[in-house]
C-alpha cells in the first residue's frame, strides 16, 4: 500500500504541471511586476475579505455592500491583466475545491465537511 503523503505530493506536482496552474502563475507574476495593478488587486481582495468576515460573523451584508464590491470588480477587471489573474485564480480555487470534495466523498466525509454548508 502506498503512503498517502506520497500520493498527495504526486497530486501537488500534477497540479503544478496543469495548464490552469501555469496560467495562474503567469498571471500572478505579471501582476506582481506592476505595483499599481498589485495594489488594485490587494484593495479588491481586502474589500472582498471584509465582506466575507462580516458574513461569517453573522453581521448583515447589505445589497449596498455587495453592489459596491461588484462595481469595484467591474472596474478593475477592465484591465486585461487583472481580469486574467482573477479568472485564473478562480479556476484554480475551483479545482482545489473539487479535489477536496472528491477526497471527502471517497472517504465518506462528505456530510461532515460539506453538509453544514448545504443546510444553510
Curated annotation (Swiss-Prot):
**Chain segments annotated as transmembrane:** none
Q: Which SUPFAM superfamilies match?
A: YheA/YmcA-like
Superkingdom classification of source: Bacteria
Give the UniProt family note. Answer: Belongs to the UPF0342 family.
- According to UniProt, the name of this protein is UPF0342 protein Csac_0863
Species of origin: Caldicellulosiruptor saccharolyticus (strain ATCC 43494 / DSM 8903 / Tp8T 6331)
